[in-house]
Amino acid sequence: MTEFLPFVARHIGPRHEDERAMLAALGLPSMETLITQAVPASIRLNRALNLPAALSEADALAELGTIMGRNVVKKSFIGAGYHGVHTPPVIQRNLFENPAWYTAYTPYQSEISQGRLELLFHFQTLVAELTGLPVACASLLDEATAVAEAIGVACRHHRDKRSRILLAGELHPQTVDVVNTRAEPLGWEIATGSDVDDNTAAIVVPWPDTRGVYGDFAKVIADAKAKGALVIAVADPLALTIMEAPARWGADMAVGSMQRYGVPMGFGGPHAAYLAVSEALTRIIPGRIVGQSVDAHGRAAYRLALQTREQHIRRDKATSNICTAQALLANMAAAFAIWHGPAGLQAIATRVAALAARFAAALKAAGVEIAGESLFDTVTAKVPGKAAAIAAEADKGGRLIRIIDADTVGVTFDETSTEEDLTALASLFGAKPVGGDTVLVPGKERGEGFLTQEVFHSHRSETEMMRFLRRLVDKDLALDRAMIPLGSCTMKLNAAAEMMPVSWNTVANLHPFAPAEQVQGYAKMTSDLEAWLCEITGFAGVSLQPNAGSQGEYAGLMAIRHYHQARGQGHRNICLIPSSAHGTNPASASMAGMSVVVVNCRPDGDIDIDDLKAKAEKHRDNLAAFMITYPSTYGVFEEGIKAFCEIVHDNGGQVYFDGANLNALVGLARPADIGADVCHMNLHKTFCIPHGGGGPGVGPIGVAKHLVPYLPGHVEAGSEHAVAAAQFGSASILVITWMYIRMMGGAGLKKATEAAILNANYIAHRLKGVYPILYTGAHDRVAHECIVDTRVLKDSAGITVEDVAKRLIDYGFHAPTMSWPVAGTLMIEPTESEPKLEIDRLCDAMIAIAGEAKKVADGVWPADDNPLANAPHTASDTLATEWKHPYTREEAVFPGGAFDPTAKYWPPVSRVDNVGGDRNLICSCPPVAAYG
């Protein structure tokens, strides 16, 4: 037997004796027997992964420390959308580095997510107040993709009858790059200048532009209004604390990055973008929206609102494929605003603006030409032929400035900038700054009349802030409390050793456009990761740029699109997608300019190979791609996977392999060997990046050799087709995956996959006598997850799948995935990290719930008044003076057998009213004046 270093044993939940007991329960002599039964022999990898041998936690941290020590951290004045920040330690320690925050899942289950939902609600309130627009989503991926998403909203608003987009000012180059990538397959015409015509869907107004200048856009905005075009403002949220809100001057939408609200640059990410819209655009805004509703007892409660507009419902008709966003970073930004309050934010903004104004004045006095008269934090200077020399001198002094071209440099100030920086930078131009606090921003009209809500005024001491964050997170159930058995989500351990490097100075505080020679640590770390992921998947090339799984899908499909175009077959636009696919699949295909044709599935859950063959042959002249999830979304290894790929290839298409379920394959099989041409990997699932309560995520893609030339490029690297603002996307959290692979090694990764499959089959075995297990493969085995059919409780007792999900909260669990991919069922994925004790506790709870349903069926409890129909039960409900239910208080909150009373989780609210919340949408907190 392979001897595993301590980390492998720490990561995998079941002990050796547990593994033996679970295999015995399945009637199996060994793990190898289980894997032979579950995984088709035709796809098995018959060799060990060629990865570096596993290291201990201490050794891996030391090795990564040496690598990242090659980075040279200098003070950045590059700007271009990325700024130095002071992350308040109270936020870093109590939120960013707190597993109670970062291990939580997207808050679909409202009752166990009230803390992070509340903070995201404050984020939306912050954005609405800054922009003057009434509706904001709970974050997007980055500023560049947010601009593209806003353009998509504008086109949808015009029912796709207008296709021209006018960029009315100079956006950051990376934003233009991403917009151009998005435009090509969707047929958007991207124009610059000030000419608004009848085909213009929207104008995009940078506020300020990439040079730091606030232009005069009054006429083009008036023309847009006259022509019915929407106005999109790309606005700096720190500047908006001292400037007129975009809605005041005509913006219908506003977007930007919240990075400078306490989130480190991280060599490009992750950061939360914002998007706010007018009320008329509410129902086509992309991303999550947190709304306020009430629970069953009339208490205020938060929930995700208007979900029917999202990709998992509307599929290829959705406005966007956005799924995972940047919830953790949005919560950091909200906490930053709560910590500083409006006066503190204005003080930061005014100081930054004053430094920039004094720098501009000094340069002017020295005879240096600068761009524009109105500016906030950035000064762009004309230095004919001297840009490189001046930047080099700044570099020698430990400061980085932006080289725009051979004759132009930019200097951007932020909250970390000092008087010493100002003097040193001015001296590079032969200038000397003078005193003063004048600022040069236009329309300096915003006073104290914003962020008047109490939450932005109540937490000035660290004691108050620490307790505020604790009160919020105590409302939630995350992996630090209990198992989160969500099918297709892979909620595995996010080990402390993996997380620690994210906060290192050499990881967190580099600008993504820093000189290449100063980021050699990142170059080595990302190169390692690309090579390891290639080995794990079998592909020839990897791009780490996509900053979510949905963006990986999009990037992969765009690579296929560009491949066909390069071969003179750009007419290929049909994408075959199984009816069981994730909702992001058809949404991504639509964004990539493809038309979706649905392939049927058989009653046993497998893809109907005859239907696939017929449709592939029917569309052989136009077939672009086939998207398949493997193991299937039903949690089964389909025997015919290689035949599926052959059919697609025989008809001129490419195979897109959705890597959502890669946790069932690592070390056992490789997508490329199976026949895939491209695959995205969810690093926030299989490779241990935490879900953060709804993001960040990372979705790199691996591609076969013929697709390598079509991987996403980046303007900073001299190439095109970027899908994210930064070349390496959410670069700073890639160290998490680096650490995971380095500490597991090839044998450890394979062992983790085997443990995940064992845990899922053990659950299926324990529950199959009570609930039907819907889909199984050969030998009655499942892959790494199983679908439990709770409809038997509906048939016998009227108990719905929602009743079961909410009752599991009383037992201390996050519910499994509900009603997907089959309505009325629960899909359970335990991952390899859960110990047998916790798995048994979940199984005991599910069996006990079936027993409770039987009491309803037998008439012991009424159908409308029983522990399941009334779940979950709060402490206040349980302690009410009157208890009129036919079951006891103990039965409500301390259910026997499966329950550990010492680990009781108390939900803060009872069942939330979802319908009422959508009918009466409240997605930001009204200002204090609204109550007057």
Swiss-Prot record:
It holds the Pfam family GcvP2_C. The modification N6-(pyridoxal phosphate)lysine is found at K685. Its EC number is 1.4.4.2. The keyword Oxidoreductase applies. Its cofactor is pyridoxal 5'-phosphate. CDD domains: GDC-P (cd00613). Keywords: Oxidoreductase, Pyridoxal phosphate. InterPro entries: GcvP (IPR003437), GDC-P_C (IPR049316), GDC-P_N (IPR049315), GDC_P (IPR020581), PyrdxlP-dep_Trfase (IPR015424), PyrdxlP-dep_Trfase_major (IPR015421), PyrdxlP-dep_Trfase_small (IPR015422). Coiled coil: none annotated. The keyword Oxidoreductase applies. GO terms for biological process: glycine decarboxylation via glycine cleavage system. GO terms for cellular component: cytosol; glycine cleavage complex. GO terms for molecular function: glycine binding; glycine dehydrogenase (decarboxylating) activity; pyridoxal phosphate binding. Gene3D superfamilies: Aspartate Aminotransferase, domain 1, Type I PLP-dependent aspartate aminotransferase-like (Major domain). It comes from the Bacteria. The glycine cleavage system is composed of four proteins: P, T, L and H. The glycine cleavage system catalyzes the degradation of glycine. The P protein binds the alpha-amino group of glycine through its pyridoxal phosphate cofactor; CO(2) is released and the remaining methylamine moiety is then transferred to the lipoamide cofactor of the H protein. Belongs to the GcvP family. This is Glycine dehydrogenase (decarboxylating). It comes from Brucella suis (strain ATCC 23445 / NCTC 10510).
